[in-house]
């Protein structure tokens, strides 16, 4: 944005408000008027080289940004709070405000202060809001994460039946999708897309049935007038936006889908004011085309973010080997929405297989891909008037890389997905690419107002203006040489002063050559006679003087015109540019997944329509990599077979028992993650994998209080379990960990027992069920499709060694006391716990509390601590005590070596 000179503020005038006896300046009157139309946004009010904020906006912004709060004038007898940010750094401040949930209205000066003065001394420079900056409508590079999409989502609803649909748009790339949903799926579908902003009709926002969903989403929800979502007017709005006479080529949309599309487009028009971001035509997603993962499962499996909200530690971070922003976003999209069509999954797997078989070629492809900038986002910035020369340069650089990739792939026998991508790359606008190469300089400025981005030789007039601007002395010297040759006057000079400007000066003795003939007089125009010299000008010199004076302005004007010409050409080729960019992202993801598979030893899964789920030597992709980084023991691979025991049968249930810290939760999660990886089209961390398509994935692993909604840990657990039991079908995969642990033992056991029976008899799905209720292992005798498996351990001298191996059978203990000891509980507490455990196991107390109290008196922990230790002869017992105190699993190699020497020394003394 160009800086403008701030106008002098006119004298105050009486405020029009009846209860406002103080006087406001015309500028402040203008501010209040504009702010009144943007009450839900912070108003960035342009004053010269700053955006100023006043009143409550200033208070909020100063706190959010950590900038000084000052004051300017008074209103209603109170000081007017004020703060400001420089225009050149506005993006940095916008980023902070958007991250904190604010929306910002950018108010610019829309006329030059000189024009305002022509209307009178008290006139205020015209200002207007040119854009509303909201979380879902960002385009600036600084405000966007290159690896994440930035979706604006709109929810549509029909009046009669209340049918729902969602439309989501990333205006930074042009992506536009729409899908129907239902009230029970609404939250899950929203969280799958993970929009930065959700726009809903104000009537729907206050709907009692939907309000809990909006409460969960929080500040990201933006209520808007219901008229924006009118499905009856949607067709006209869509036709107007896409500049088409009919929607026949768009496909068929339901009424709620039209409502959602209308709401999304209307909000973009509202926030972008006069600009129109180029969008792809809405692409419809069909129900059942992707794996349904509810929000609780998505969170517990830490697909894109960990439970604490970080990308590090997530599955996405573990598998991401992409080298472009577009590729990273496509990978994230595939991970969060795995497919359910074996045919489509196979197409993606074929691409990865081809890349693995052509590793040399793929290494060359990745080198080219590393040079691909974010073309769709550059295009979007150009289209909405926020682009710069470097955005044009990004397109040029992308075209060059695409050309290199097309050359590398020339003649290659590609699988279907990659062949289609190559075709899109080959259709990129070669003429426009060549135009950019001719027009753009090698080094490009950030801002177009700085000029210097057009290549020398592209435009002759621009070259002339630059020459005049940068080399005026040389141009004048050249013209002087021409005049000397023409007149034969060796002493002729071209000089300059502030009165005459440029002029030709000759001695009086030589002036005859310029005055003796009519032709000479018409050629050399007399300007001034001096005592010993005469001064002349020419039409040519006068024009040159004017050109020199205006050369800089003219040069910039020409460059800006060229910029607009190139921008218009880019927008005209938007579809082919986006198609080529999408194709490059496909190659990036395919090669990245091949690199991952080679690097981590992944295998190609076999995915079909069966109910099989047979994983041989499966591993947890995140934990395995973490262990490698720490140079720790290698991950222990385990099998998992939930396939039907006979043809036509239902999937199996594994009941998993074992100690805490034994690896149960890791085993459960890894199988869910393997299913997700397989269906997103990735190789998987296993020796082999045969997976019948999972249509719904449910995971209840770990829980916490939901204090904001008044839910205890147990209540959260029960709500999530209820959702699973009510929705899982035969093609579902269910992962349940320690159901019933948050309540009394018998209550928890009863609930877990009944839940397993229901999964077996009613849901009839493939399931992994981990529990510490060892009594449940008896279910294997009653339920034919249920098998007992356990995490293997070894015991040694009251300690437990976790083998992290899954084996057939059941555990009879949970080894909680040993784990407590490893966690560092005081030795007295551990010993006391061991005594209590022995009494409980020996007595089978079954609720006989009085006998238990007699056997285990209160405060016995303290009594044990306070018992005087028997006096023993150090010489006789020191070696035995030292051996007894050893905890082998807690020793480092160095400590073990030192201990051996110590024991040898003690043995010698004995």
Swiss-Prot record:
GO biological process terms, semicolon-separated: mismatch repair
Residue ranges of the TM segments: none
MF (Gene Ontology): ATP binding; ATP-dependent DNA damage sensor activity; damaged DNA binding; mismatched DNA binding
A GO term from the CC aspect: cytosol
Ranges where the record places region Disordered: 1-21
Comp. bias intervals (Basic and acidic residues): 1-11
Keywords tagged on the record: ATP-binding, DNA damage, DNA repair, DNA-binding, Nucleotide-binding
Pfam family, one: MutS_V
SUPFAM superfamilies named in the record: DNA repair protein MutS, domain I, DNA repair protein MutS, domain II, DNA repair protein MutS, domain III, P-loop containing nucleoside triphosphate hydrolases
InterPro entries noted in UniProt: DNA_mismatch_repair_MutS, DNA_mismatch_repair_MutS-lik_N, DNA_mismatch_repair_MutS/MSH, DNA_mismatch_repair_MutS_C, DNA_mismatch_repair_MutS_clamp, DNA_mismatch_repair_MutS_core, DNA_mismatch_repair_MutS_N, DNA_mismatch_repair_MutS_sf
PROSITE patterns to which the protein is assigned, alphabetical: DNA_MISMATCH_REPAIR_2 (PS00486)
Protein residues bound to ATP: 658-665
Family according to the record: Belongs to the DNA mismatch repair MutS family.
Role description: This protein is involved in the repair of mismatches in DNA. It is possible that it carries out the mismatch recognition step. This protein has a weak ATPase activity.
Protein name as catalogued: DNA mismatch repair protein MutS
Source organism of this protein record: Brucella suis (strain ATCC 23445 / NCTC 10510)
Gene: mutS
């Amino acid at each position: 944005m160009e800086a403008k000179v701030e106008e002098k503020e006119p004298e105050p005038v009486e405020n029009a408000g009846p209860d406002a006896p103080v006087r406001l300046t015309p500028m402040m009157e203008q501010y209040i008027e504009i702010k009144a139309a943007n009450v839900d946004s912070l108003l960035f009010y342009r004053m010269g080289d700053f955006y100023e904020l006043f009143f409550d906006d200033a208070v909020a912004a100063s706190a959010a940004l950590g900038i000084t709060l000052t004051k300017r004038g008074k209103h209603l007898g109170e000081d007017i709070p004020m703060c400001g940010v420089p225009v050149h750094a506005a993006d940095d401040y916008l980023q902070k405000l958007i991250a904190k949930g604010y929306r910002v209205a950018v108010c610019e000066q829309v006329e030059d202060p000189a024009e305002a003065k022509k209307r009178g001394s008290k006139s205020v420079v015209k200002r207007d809001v040119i854009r509303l900056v909201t979380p879902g409508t960002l385009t600036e590079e600084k405000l966007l994460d290159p690896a994440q999409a930035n979706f604006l989502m709109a929810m549509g609803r029909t009046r009669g039946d209340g049918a729902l649909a969602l439309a989501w748009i990333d205006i930074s790339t042009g992506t536009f999708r729409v899908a129907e949903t239902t009230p029970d799926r609404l939250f899950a579908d929203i969280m799958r897309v993970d929009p930065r902003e959700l726009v809903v009709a104000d009537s729907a926002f206050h709907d009692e049935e939907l309000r809990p969903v909006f409460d969960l989403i929080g500040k990201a929800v933006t209520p808007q007038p219901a008229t924006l979502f009118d499905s009856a007017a949607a067709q006209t709005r869509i036709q107007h936006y896409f500049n088409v006479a009919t929607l026949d080529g768009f496909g068929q949309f339901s009424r709620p889908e039209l409502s959602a599309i209308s709401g999304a487009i209307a909000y973009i028009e509202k926030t972008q004011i006069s600009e129109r971001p180029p969008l792809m035509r809405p692409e419809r997603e069909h129900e059942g085309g992707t794996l349904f993962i509810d929000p609780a499962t998505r969170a517990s499996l830490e697909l894109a973010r960990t439970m604490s909200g970080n990308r590090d530690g997530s599955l996405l971070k573990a598998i991401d080997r992409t080298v472009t922003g577009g590729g990273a976003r496509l990978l994230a999209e595939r991970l969060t929405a795995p497919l359910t069509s074996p045919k489509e999954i196979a197409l993606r797997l074929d691409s990865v297989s081809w890349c693995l078989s052509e590793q040399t070629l793929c290494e060359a492809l990745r080198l080219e891909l590393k040079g691909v900038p974010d073309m769709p986002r550059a295009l979007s910035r150009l289209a909405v008037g926020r682009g710069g020369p470097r955005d044009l340069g990004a397109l040029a650089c992308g075209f060059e890389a695409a050309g290199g990739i097309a050359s590398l792939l020339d003649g290659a026998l590609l699988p279907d997905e990659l062949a289609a991508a190559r075709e899109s790359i080959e259709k990129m606008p070669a003429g426009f690419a060549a135009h950019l190469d001719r027009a753009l300089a090698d080094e490009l400025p950030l801002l177009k107002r700085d000029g210097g981005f057009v290549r020398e030789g592209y435009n002759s007039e621009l070259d002339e203006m630059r020459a005049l601007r940068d080399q005026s002395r040389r141009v004048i010297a050249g013209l002087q040489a021409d005049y000397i040759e023409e007149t034969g006057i060796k002493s002729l000079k071209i000089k300059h002063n502030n009165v005459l400007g440029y002029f030709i000066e000759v001695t009086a003795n030589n002036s005859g050559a310029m005055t003796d003939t009519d032709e000479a007089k018409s050629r050399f125009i007399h300007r001034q006679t001096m005592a010993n010299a005469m001064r002349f000008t020419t039409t040519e010199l006068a024009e040159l003087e004017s050109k020199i004076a205006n050369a800089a302005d003219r040069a910039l004007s020409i460059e800006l015109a060229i910029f607009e010409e190139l921008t218009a050409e880019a927008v005209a080729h938007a579809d082919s540019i986006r198609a080529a960019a999408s194709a490059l992202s496909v190659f990036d993801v395919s090669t990245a997944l091949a690199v991952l598979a080679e690097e981590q030893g992944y295998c190609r899964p076999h995915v079909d329509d069966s109910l099989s789920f047979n994983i041989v030597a499966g591993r947890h992709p995140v934990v395995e990599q973490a262990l490698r980084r720490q140079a720790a023991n290698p991950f222990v691979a385990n099998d998992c077979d939930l396939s039907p025991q006979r043809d036509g049968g239902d999937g199996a249930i594994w009941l998993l028992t074992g100690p805490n810290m034994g690896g149960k939760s890791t085993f459960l999660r890894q199988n869910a993650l393997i299913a997700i990886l397989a269906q997103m089209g990735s190789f998987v961390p296993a020796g082999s994998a045969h997976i019948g398509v999972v249509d719904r994935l449910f995971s209840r692993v770990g829980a916490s209080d939901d204090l904001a909604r008044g839910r205890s840990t147990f209540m959260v657990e029960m709500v999530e379990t209820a959702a699973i039991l009510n929705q899982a079908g035969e093609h579902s995969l269910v992962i349940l960990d320690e159901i019933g642990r948050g309540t009394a033992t018998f209550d928890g056991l009863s609930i877990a027992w009944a839940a397993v029976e229901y999964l077996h008899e009613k849901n009839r799905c493939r399931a992994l069920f981990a529990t510490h209720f060892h009594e449940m292992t008896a279910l294997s005798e009653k339920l034919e499709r249920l098998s007992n498996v356990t995490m293997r351990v070894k015991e040694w001298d009251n300690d437990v060694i976790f083998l992290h191996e899954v084996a057939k059978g059941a555990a009879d203990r949970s080894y909680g006391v040993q784990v407590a000891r490893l966690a560092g509980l005081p030795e007295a507490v551990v010993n006391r716990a061991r005594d209590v455990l022995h009494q409980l196991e020996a007595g089978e107390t079954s609720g006989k509390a009085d006998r238990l109290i007699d056997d285990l008196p209160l405060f016995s922990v303290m009594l044990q601590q306070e018992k005087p230790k028997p006096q023993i002869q150090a010489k006789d017992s020191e070696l035995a005590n030292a051996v007894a105190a050893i905890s082998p699993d807690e020793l480092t190699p160095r400590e073990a070596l030192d201990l051996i020497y110590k024991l040898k020394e003690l043995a010698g003394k004995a």
